[in-house]
Amino acid sequence: MSKEIAKKRIEELRDLLNTFNYQYHVLDNPSVSDAEYDRNMQELIKLEAENPEFMSEDSPSVRVGGTVLDIFEKVTHKSPMLSLGNAFNEGDLRDFDRRVRQGIDGANVRYICELKIDGLAVSLHYEKGRFIQGATRGDGVTGEDITQNLKTIKAIPLRLNEEVTLEARGEAYMPKRSFVKLNEEKEQNGEDVFANPRNAAAGSIRQLDPKIAAKRNLSMFVYGLANVEEKTIPSHSESLDFLGELGFKTNPNRRTCETIEEVIAYVEEWQEKRPHLDYEIDGIVIKVDDVALQESLGTTAKSPRWAIAYKFPAEEVVTRLTGIELSVGRTGVVTPTAELEPVRVAGTIVRRASLHNEDLIREKDIRIGDYVVVKKAGDIIPEVVNVIFDKRTGEEEEYRMPTHCPACESELVRLEEEVALRCINPTCPAQIREGLIHFVSRNAMNIDGLGERVITQLFDADYIRTFADLYALTKEQLLQLERFGEKSATNLIQAIENSKENSLERLLFGLGIRHVGAKAARTFAEHFETMDELVKATEEELKAINEIGEKMAQSVVTYFDNEDVLELLQQFKEYGVNMTYKGIKIADLQNVESYFAGKTVVLTGKLEVMGRSEAKKKIEALGGKVTGSVSKSTDLVVAGEAAGSKLAQAEKHNVEVWNEERFLQELNK
C-alpha cells in the first residue's frame, strides 16, 4: 500500500470511528455491531503503526470516548475513567502476560478475572458513607451528573455500612428478562424498542425524568475502588471484598489466577456459561491483582498496562431473509417479523427475527431476498442487525407495510408520537384472540390447561369471542376439539370454574387495560376492594393513589366509560366471577398466625404482582424478618424474575426457595 493510499485510508477510518464513538458514547445509539467496530479499530491501529508519520494526538486509537451532551450537569472525574486495551484470542492474552512480566522485572504476579458486564460505566461518590453524586464515564475525564437516576437503582446503597469517603466504579445494566418485558411493553404501546439490554440501560439512566429510570428494573455491579480516604488496600480482590462489606453489589463470579493458563481456562469456561446468565457480558476483564504492581506498570494515554479486556467473538451469523410476516397484538399494534432460512445463533436454530416496525425496515433498507446479519439481542431475541448490500443481485423486493389490518382489513393508523401502525377496530379477531390468551395467562386468571393452542382452537370453532364466553363453555363443546378426551375436558371445565374465585387483581390485569400491569392492578384492587368502586372512580381519585400517574388514570377511566365493558362486567357477575379483593391488607395483618412469624426471609429478583417493598412490609407485619443476604440463618428465599446469585447461595446453604406464586398463596391464606 502506497503512503498516499495509507494516509487516505487512515483518515477514512478516523472519521468512521469518530462517528461510531459519537453514536455509541454520546447518543447511546450504536449503528454497528461491536465486531464491526473492533475490525475497523484494529485496521487503524495497524496502519498507524506501519505509518507513524501520520499519527495524530486526536486519533480514535489514542483518544478516550467522546464529547458530553449539555442535557445534564458536567462532572470532572477526580481520576480518569480509562478504557481497557482489548484481547481477541489466546495469543493476545499471552502477549499481555509477557508484557506484564517484563514490566515487573520478575516479580510474582497474580491475576484477577471478572465478567465484563455489558452496560453503562458509572462512578459513585460517597462522603462519610452517604451517596452524594453519581456520574457517567463520558469522555473519561468529564461525565454527566446522573445522581437522581442512580438513586432509583436498588443495588446502589444510599448509605454504606461504614462512614467512609470513597469513589467506587461499576457497571449499570438491565437484566435480560427485564429487557424482554420492556420491549414487549414498548411494542404494545407503539413505541421504538431498544436494540439490546446495554442500550436499554443507557437510555434509562440518561432519562431526565428519574421516574422512568425507576420503572426500568436496572441493577449494578461495582467493579472497582478508584480512591478511599484513610485506608490502604493492597490488592484489587481485597478492595472488592471491602466494597461487598460496605453494602455494594459485586459480581460473585470473579476468580484469582496464578498463571495465564488459568486465565485462559476461566475465559473458556465463561464463554460456555455466558448464555445462562440473566445479564449480558461481552467478555472477561483480566487485571493484575497487586495494587503496588499496578502502580509500577502504570498507564498509557488510553488504558492501564495492568489490565486487559478479552472480547468474546460476536454471536452474529449471515442468513437469507425469505419473507416478512405480520402479527397483530392485543393492543392492535401490527408487528413485522422476518422469515429466515434456518440458521444456528448462540446455540439455537433461528427461523424468525423481529423487525419491530416499519421505520426500522426503511432505516436498514431491508428487502425480501436480502442476505442479512442476525444476532440475539441480549442473547435472547433474534434480531436483524444489518443488510449485506454487497450480496444484492437486484432481484430483491422492497417491502411496504400494508394500509389495512391483515386480520380484519380495517384501515391502519399511526397515532401521535407512535412509530407503530395500529388497528383500532375493537372487533378485530386477532386482537380478541391475543386478548383472550392474555386473560387466561399465569399472572391473570391463571387457568391451567388453557394456553395459546386451546384458545386458538376455541376461537376458530367460534365458541369464544369475549372473556365472559369462557365461563359459558361446556364439556360437550371441548370434546368436539382435537386432543380433548373426557378427562382433559372435565379438568379444563373445573379449572375455568376454579378461576371464578380469583382475587380482583387477577381479573383486572386479565382485562388488559392499557398501561395497567400486574402490580398496578393489585394496587387498584387493594385500594378500592371491589370492581364497582373502581368503576366509579374519577381520574383525580386514581391519580391520588401512590405510583399511579396521569396516563394510567386516564386509561382506566376511558376503559370503564364504555357500554360494552360494563356489559362484560355484568356477565361476569351472572356467571359468578368474583370481583372483590381477597388479599390481606397490611393493616389487617396484626396478630394473625402466620408461617412467616419468627422466620428470616430474603427477597430476590423482580416480583411481578407485588413489589418487593410491599412484600417486605407484609412479611414484617406477619412477624417475619426480611434481610438482604442469604446465610445459614435464612429460612426462606422468595425468587422473582431475574433472580441472581442469591439462588446459588440458597442452594449452598440448603435454604427453601419459593416462586412468587407460592409466596402469594401463603400470604393470602
Swiss-Prot record:
Kindly state which reaction or reactions the protein catalyses.
NAD(+) + (deoxyribonucleotide)n-3'-hydroxyl + 5'-phospho-(deoxyribonucleotide)m = (deoxyribonucleotide)n+m + AMP + beta-nicotinamide D-nucleotide
Instruction: Give the molecular function GO annotations.
Output: DNA binding; DNA ligase (NAD+) activity; metal ion binding
- The answer to whether the entry has keyword DNA repair is yes
Q: Where does NAD(+) bind?
A: 34-38, 83-84, 114, 137, 171, 287, 311
The cofactors it requires, by name, are: Mg(2+); Mn(2+)
State a single Pfam family of this protein: DNA_ligase_ZBD
Q: Which InterPro entries match?
A: BRCT_dom, BRCT_dom_sf, DisA/LigA_HHH, DNA_ligase, DNA_ligase_AS, DNA_ligase_CS, DNAligase_adenylation, DNAligase_N
Q: Where is the BRCT domain?
A: 591-669
- What does UniProt give as the signal peptide span? none
Q: List the disulfide bonds.
A: none
Look at the named UniProt entry and state the broad enzyme category this protein falls under.
ligase
User: What is the protein name for this chain?
Assistant: DNA ligase
The species is: Bacillus cereus (strain ATCC 14579 / DSM 31 / CCUG 7414 / JCM 2152 / NBRC 15305 / NCIMB 9373 / NCTC 2599 / NRRL B-3711)
